[in-house]
């Protein structure tokens, strides 16, 4: 009998959460991660499912996600412990046929529940499904140190944050040409911050929560982790630049345009036109 803990998706979640912990992005129970699956992914492991799956209603219906399975991190769970006990810290859930709630098919033992940021995740999944024609499958939230730091010293608007991150490392414009969305500070774990994040996810694969963290979206766990990692590396460079007295020179507008042409991407116009 196949064991679900050996599946590609459980093993992938173990690696992503462990890597994020080692990066210092997910202290204590900080951060959350969800991966949209297909029925074919989970079907071979039905023997591992709970005999009586618990049902939890969503705070608002999400018919676009009807009958869709996900693997999710649990509420109050530490990323550093996922590798030690996947079944206690992860869960496979499946949205019901009308999108009104979900059953916990596997994991989240001892009456654990999915991440408190599930509204933000599911709403963002809906928007990224539409924006990428179903290509994006992952939503990752973490407390990337240097990205958080920048929200204290830079004006919190999309064009400026995006432009500075592009300048912090040449690869950034190629990796996230759609720029970085940013919210005002909001109380986490609410439908309101979930809706605001999803609205930004219509246009951007990265969304900053000032003084808190970042949301990233991508087609795979590796791509999503790499997206955040790239932005965080640029933020680290910027933090060092500002601590050394600021930029003396940087990548110019003309060079950014040339970079976009070379790699066949269309940079966010407002960031290009900023100065």
Curated annotation (Swiss-Prot):
Pathway: Carbohydrate degradation; L-rhamnose degradation; glycerone phosphate from L-rhamnose: step 3/3. It catalyses: L-rhamnulose 1-phosphate = (S)-lactaldehyde + dihydroxyacetone phosphate. It comes from the Bacteria. Zn(2+) binds at residues 141, 143, 212. Its EC number is 4.1.2.19. One of its GO terms (cellular component) is cytosol. It holds the Pfam family Aldolase_II. One of its GO terms (biological process) is pentose catabolic process. GO terms for molecular function: aldehyde-lyase activity; metal ion binding; rhamnulose-1-phosphate aldolase activity. The keyword Zinc applies. Homotetramer. This is Rhamnulose-1-phosphate aldolase. It comes from Salmonella typhimurium (strain LT2 / SGSC1412 / ATCC 700720).
């Amino acid at each position: 009998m196949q064991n679900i803990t050996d599946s590609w998706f459980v093993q992938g979640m173990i690696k992503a959460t462990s890597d994020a912990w080692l990066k210092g992005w997910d202290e204590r129970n900080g951060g959350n991660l969800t991966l949209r699956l297909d029925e074919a992914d989970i079907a071979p492991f039905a023997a591992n499912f709970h005999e009586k799956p618990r049902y939890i209603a969503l705070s608002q219906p999400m018919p676009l996600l009807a009958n869709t399975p996900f693997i999710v991190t649990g509420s109050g769970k530490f990323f550093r412990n996922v590798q030690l006990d996947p079944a206690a810290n992860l869960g496979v859930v499946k949205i019901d046929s009308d999108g009104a709630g979900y059953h916990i098919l596997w994991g989240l033992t001892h009456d654990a529940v999915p991440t408190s940021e599930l509204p933000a995740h599911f709403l963002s999944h809906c928007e990224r499904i539409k924006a990428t024609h179903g290509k994006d499958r992952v939503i990752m939230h973490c407390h990337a140190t240097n990205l958080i730091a920048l929200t204290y010293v830079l004006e919190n608007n999309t064009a400026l944050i995006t432009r500075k991150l592009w300048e912090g490392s040449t690869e950034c414009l190629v990796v996230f040409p759609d720029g970085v969305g940013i919210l005002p500070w909001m109380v986490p774990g609410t439908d309101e911050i979930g809706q605001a994040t999803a609205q930004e996810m219509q246009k951007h694969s990265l969304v900053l929560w000032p003084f808190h963290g970042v949301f990233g979206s991508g087609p795979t766990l590796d791509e999503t982790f790499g997206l955040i990692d790239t932005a965080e590396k640029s933020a680290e460079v910027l933090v060092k630049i500002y601590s050394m007295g600021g930029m003396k020179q940087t990548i110019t507008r003309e060079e950014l345009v040339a970079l976009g042409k070379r790699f066949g991407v269309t940079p966010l116009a407002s960031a290009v036109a900023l100065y």
